[in-house]
Amino acid sequence: MTIAVGRAPAGRGWFDVLDDWLKRDRFVFVGWSGLLLFPCAYMALGGWLTGTTFVTSWYTHGIASSYLEGCNFLTAAVSTPADSMGHSLLLLWGPEAQGDFVRWCQLGGLWAFVALHGAFGLIGFMLRQFEIARLVGIRPYNAIAFSGPIAVFVSVFLMYPLGQSSWFFAPSFGVAAIFRFLLFLQGFHNWTLNPFHMMGVAGILGGALLCAIHGATVENTLFEDGDGANTFKAFEPTQEEETYSMVTANRFWSQIFGIAFSNKRWLHFFMLFVPVMGLWTSSIGIIGLALNLRAYDFVSQELRAAEDPEFETFYTKNILLNEGLRAWMAPADQPHENFIFPEEVLPRGNAL
């Protein structure tokens, strides 16, 4: 009698087949994250290119915003929906457009389309970094760092208008449109005096400074291990030895500042921490603006400036500038409100 000892082959279902195909080694890795990333990124970019090329903002903002109307790259934009649309998702088949594509574009449906697909596309890109890090066998700090840009995008384009009356008050997708939004935040929220904005500026500019210092220090302390005109060709990705002298760099900065990094791991974590923390804190600040929270109001200075014409500080000057931004900007920015301000209430500088 013959006895066969072995393990029955496990049945492979459709999930295993799909998992193998998604994770196959190819020029552009797909992965499970790609099922979210690639369609959403394609839709967001395609919607933005379509909107900036063909779609007007006449019905939502009373302005031209496309190449077809004469705008250029800096002035074209996919504009936010009309204020009357509230926080509707503006689905093409929804009650606002009722399947009419042209009407959907006129109402600002492309903005909601680009914003939502863009947000999920960014999340898909972060998941892509998680997925590849796990497959390669490294830690997922790239994905954690990318949470900073995601937090900024979601807070600025989604959370802020959700706290306001409608999507209308979100930034439109365009260069000059973003500049308009920055002026709006300053005029209506005094954003530059917000401590979360200050932390964001410190993080981003501090990160740029750290990047420049680190790159320059490494270039300064490269080992002279090549005969070429430059040292770039002397480096091999698989070499075991160091390519620059950490000891020399530490000695240099110890002489400059009296203190210096002596641990490469702590140094690079600090370079990760500073800009990402700046992005996170600025995102928290934007959510505060969505709720119309005030930051620093130095009322005592405002009261004294109102009583004493000779008393003025940079704070009181900025408050007057903000009033000017609101008074001059609102009629042009919100034409549907039909704001009409009498000449005597419009703030003017001393020179006028």
UniProtKB/Swiss-Prot annotation:
Organism ancestry: Bacteria, Bacillati, Cyanobacteriota, Cyanophyceae, Synechococcales
Keywords: Chlorophyll, Chromophore, Electron transport, Iron, Magnesium, Membrane, Metal-binding, Oxidoreductase, Photosynthesis, Photosystem II, Thylakoid, Transmembrane, Transmembrane helix, Transport
Binding site for pheophytin a: 129, 142
Subunit structure: PSII is composed of 1 copy each of membrane proteins PsbA, PsbB, PsbC, PsbD, PsbE, PsbF, PsbH, PsbI, PsbJ, PsbK, PsbL, PsbM, PsbT, PsbX, PsbY, PsbZ, Psb30/Ycf12, peripheral proteins PsbO, CyanoQ (PsbQ), PsbU, PsbV and a large number of cofactors. It forms dimeric complexes.
UniProt remark on cofactor binding: The D1/D2 heterodimer binds P680, chlorophylls that are the primary electron donor of PSII, and subsequent electron acceptors. It shares a non-heme iron and each subunit binds pheophytin, quinone, additional chlorophylls, carotenoids and lipids. There is also a Cl(-1) ion associated with D1 and D2, which is required for oxygen evolution. The PSII complex binds additional chlorophylls, carotenoids and specific lipids.
Residues that hold Fe cation according to the record: 214, 268
Binding site for a plastoquinone: 214, 261
Catalytic reactions on record: 2 a plastoquinone + 4 hnu + 2 H2O = 2 a plastoquinol + O2
One family name in Pfam for this protein: Photo_RC
EC annotation from Swiss-Prot or TrEMBL: 1.10.3.9
One record GO biological process: photosynthetic electron transport in photosystem II
HAMAP family in the cross-refs: PSII_PsbD_D2
Family: Belongs to the reaction center PufL/M/PsbA/D family.
Chief location bin: membrane
Native source species: Synechococcus sp. (strain RCC307)
SUPFAM superfamilies (UniProt xref): Bacterial photosystem II reaction centre, L and M subunits
Classification via InterPro entries: D1/D2 (IPR055266), Photo_II_D1/D2_sf (IPR036854), Photo_RC_L/M (IPR000484), Photo_RC_L/M_CS (IPR055265), PSII_PsbD/D2 (IPR005868)
Job description of the protein: Photosystem II (PSII) is a light-driven water:plastoquinone oxidoreductase that uses light energy to abstract electrons from H(2)O, generating O(2) and a proton gradient subsequently used for ATP formation. It consists of a core antenna complex that captures photons, and an electron transfer chain that converts photonic excitation into a charge separation. The D1/D2 (PsbA/PsbD) reaction center heterodimer binds P680, the primary electron donor of PSII as well as several subsequent electron acceptors. D2 is needed for assembly of a stable PSII complex.
A single cellular component GO annotation: photosystem II
Protein name: Photosystem II D2 protein
Subcellular location: Cellular thylakoid membrane
